[in-house]
From Swiss-Prot:
Organism: Treponema pallidum (strain Nichols)
GO cellular component: cytoplasm
Subcellular location: Cytoplasm
Keyword match Cell cycle: yes
InterPro entries: Mur-like_cat_sf, Mur_ligase_C, Mur_ligase_C_dom_sf, Mur_ligase_cen, Mur_ligase_N, MurCDEF_pg_biosynth, UDP-N-AcMur_Ala_ligase_MurC
Protein's UniProt name: UDP-N-acetylmuramate--L-alanine ligase
Domain of life: Bacteria
High-level lineage: Bacteria, Pseudomonadati, Spirochaetota, Spirochaetia, Spirochaetales
This protein's UniProt keywords: ATP-binding, Cell cycle, Cell division, Cell shape, Cell wall biogenesis/degradation, Cytoplasm, Ligase, Nucleotide-binding, Peptidoglycan synthesis
PANTHER family according to UniProt: UDP-N-ACETYLMURAMATE--L-ALANINE LIGASE, UDP-N-ACETYLMURAMATE--L-ALANINE LIGASE-RELATED
Function, as annotated: Cell wall formation.
C-alpha cells in the first residue's frame, strides 16, 4: 500500500472515492470538486439522499464496487474508513496497482494541515454545533469552508459551506481515534463520555483519546470547552496540567467569563438565553438546553474567527449571529421536523446513546408540553446496547409511549448472543408503563396507525433504519385527510 497525500492545490487531480455515498465522503467530494479536482466514486446501489448531491455536482458514481471502477487510472484513491482491502475488491485492486490511497480521516487531516483549521468534537452535539457554525460563516462572510456530518437545513441538502479557503472548520469524529489525523488550531469540545464500546474498552480509553486530540493543538492554540459536561471537565483538567500554554475558554452555565450561560426559558418555540459577556438576549429555535450549549460553543468559535479576520467584533457581527441562531432549523436527523398532518407532528433524531435520548426527549417535552410523545427507538450496535442496557431502559421517562425493535447491527461487529432487542424491551417494561416490541420496524405500522392521534408528537430515535417509519406514517395520515 502506498499512503497517498492530498496537496493544498487539488485542481486537475483525478480523485476516486470508494464509499462516496456516505455523508462525510459526499461532503468531501463537494469540497474537492469546488477546488477543481476531477472526482469520481463508487458505492452500493442503494439510493441515499447524498445521491442527489453527487448528481448535482456531476460526479460519476459507479455501482457496485468493482476493480473496473479504477479503469480511469485515478491519481489518488480516498476510501471510507468502513472499508478494508480484505473485504473490498476495488480497494484491494487500488493497493495492488500501487495507486496512492488514503482514508477519509487521513484526507481530512491533509486538508486541515494546509489551512488554519478548527475541529468540532464531542460524543454528543458536534454535528449541530458544526452546522450552526456553517450558517454563521455564511452570515458573517468569513473566508472559510465548513464540513458538517449531516445535511444542514436551508443549505440545499448540502453538508458543506464553501465561503473561502483561509479557514477550514470540520466535524471531527472520535471513533477509532479518527480525529487524531486532524491538525486543529482551535477546538470546540462539546461532551465526553464512554461510547463506541466495540473500540473503546473503557471510559478511561476514550478520555485518553480526547486528551491526545487536545494535545494536537499548537502552542497558544484555543480550546473552547463545555464546562457543564463532566467528561469535558475531566479531560480539560488532564490537558491543563500538561499543556498550560493553551488558551482555555469555558462555556456553559458553570462557566466564568464571556460565555457564562443563563437560560431564561421557552418562548414561542424558542429558548431564550443570555451570555455574561454580551448585552441582550439570544434565542435558539431548537428544543433542549443542550441546544443552547451547542449554540454558545458555536458563537465562541465564530467570534474568535471574526476577530482574526476583521480585527474586532462589532454590533453588526453580534446582530448577524443572533439572526442565525433564531432562524437555525437544525440539520438532517437532528430534531428534524418531517412535517405535521392531522395534528400529528412527525420528527426524527439520530440520538442513539442514553444521554442523547434523555436530553432529546426532555427538550421535546419542554418545547411541546401540550403534546403526547410517542417514541420509536432502534438501538444501534450490540456492544453499545450491552454496555448501557440499564441506562437505555431508563432513558424514556419523558415519553408517553415507547416502541422498540431488534438491535440494528453494525457491520463492524459480530453478534455474540449477549443481548438483543427483547432483552432491552423486558428491562424497559419495568421502568415504563407503555412499552411495545416489534422485531422488524415495519411490523409496528398497523399499531401506530391506530395509536397516533391529533396532538401527538411522533419521533423516531436512533442510528438504525427506523427513520423510514416516520415517512411511511406521515404519508399514510396525509392520504387519510
Amino acid at each position: 500500500m502506498k499512503r497517498g497525500t492530498l496537496p493544498k492545490d487539488v485542481s486537475g487531480i483525478k480523485i476516486h472515492m470508494i464509499g462516496i455515498k456516505g455523508t462525510g465522503m459526499s461532503a468531501l467530494a463537494e469540497l474537492l470538486c469546488a477546488r477543481g479536482a476531477r472526482v469520481s466514486g463508487s458505492d452500493v446501489a442503494d439510493v441515499f439522499y447524498t445521491d442527489r448531491i453527487l448528481a448535482r455536482l456531476g460526479v460519476p458514481v459507479r455501482t457496485p464496487f468493482s476493480c473496473q471502477n479504477l479503469a480511469d487510472a485515478p491519481d489518488v484513491v480516498i476510501h471510507s474508513a468502513a472499508y478494508v482491502p480484505e473485504e473490498n475488491d476495488e480497494l484491494a485492486e487500488a493497493y495492488r496497482r500501487g495507486i496512492p490511497t488514503l482514508t477519509y480521516p487521513e484526507a481530512l487531516g491533509d486538508i486541515s494541515c494546509a489551512r488554519f483549521s478548527c475541529g468540532i468534537a464531542g460524543v454528543h452535539g458536534k454535528t449541530t454545533t458544526t452546522a450552526m457554525i456553517a450558517q454563521m460563516v455564511k452570515e458573517l462572510r468569513l473566508d472559510a469552508s465548513v464540513l458538517v456530518g449531516s445535511a444542514v437545513s436551508g443549505n440545499n441538502d448540502s453538508c458543506v459551506v464553501l465561503n473561502g479557503d483561509t479557514f477550514f472548520i470540520a466535524e471531527t469524529c472520535e471513533y477509532r481515534r479518527h480525529f487524531l489525523h486532524f491538525h486543529p488550531q482551535k477546538i470546540v469540545l462539546t461532551s465526553v463520555e464512554h461510547d463506541h464500546q466495540d473500540y473503546y474498552s473503557s471510559y478511561e480509553d476514550i478520555l485518553a483519546a480526547y486528551f491526545h486530540y487536545i494535545d494536537r493543538l499548537p502552542q497558544f492554540g484555543e480550546l473552547f470547552y463545555c464546562v457543564d459536561d463532566q467528561g469535558v471537565r475531566e479531560v480539560v483538567q488532564l490537558a491543563f496540567f500538561s499543556r498550560p500554554d493553551l488558551v482555555y475558554v469555558p462555556y456553559g452555565e458553570r462557566a466564568w467569563g464571556d460565555y457564562g450561560v443563563s437560560i431564561h426559558g421557552v418562548q414561542d418555540r424558542k429558548i431564550s438565553f443570555s451570555l455574561r459577556g454580551f448585552a441582550g438576549e439570544f434565542y435558539v429555535a431548537l428544543p433542549g438546553e443542550h441546544s443552547v450549549l451547542n449554540a454558545t460553543g458555536a458563537l465562541a468559535l465564530a467570534l474568535s474567527l471574526v476577530k482574526k479576520q476583521y480585527g474586532e467584533v462589532t454590533v453588526e457581527h453580534l446582530t448577524a449571529l443572533r439572526k442565525v441562531l433564531a432562524l437555525f432549523q437544525g440539520c438532517r436527523r437532528r430534531s428534524e421536523v418531517l412535517g405535521e398532518v392531522r395534528g400529528i407532528l412527525f420528527m426524527d433524531d439520530y440520538g442513539h446513546h442514553p444521554t442523547a435520548i434523555k436530553k432529546t426527549l426532555r427538550g421535546l417535552k419542554t418545547f411541546f408540553p401540550e403534546r403526547r410523545i410517542v417514541v420509536d427507538f432502534m438501538s444501534h450496535t450490540y456492544s453499545r446496547t450491552a454496555a448501557l442496557l440499564t441506562e437505555f431502559a431508563e432513558s424514556f421517562q419523558d415519553a408517553d409511549v415507547v416502541i422498540l425493535h431488534e438491535i440494528y447491527a453494525s457491520a463492524r461487529e459480530v453478534y455474540q448472543g449477549e443481548v438483543n432487542g427483547e432483552h432491552l424491551f423486558e428491562l424497559t417494561k419495568r421502568k415504563h408503563r407503555r412499552v411495545y416490541y416489534y422485531e422488524a420496524v415495519m411490523q409496528a405500522v398497523p399499531f401506530l396507525q391506530a395509536e397516533l392521534k391529533e396532538g401527538d408528537l411522533f419521533v423516531t430515535l436512533g442510528a438504525g433504519d427506523n427513520c423510514k417509519l416516520g415517512e411511511v406514517l406521515f404519508n399514510y395520515f396525509k392520504e387519510e385527510v
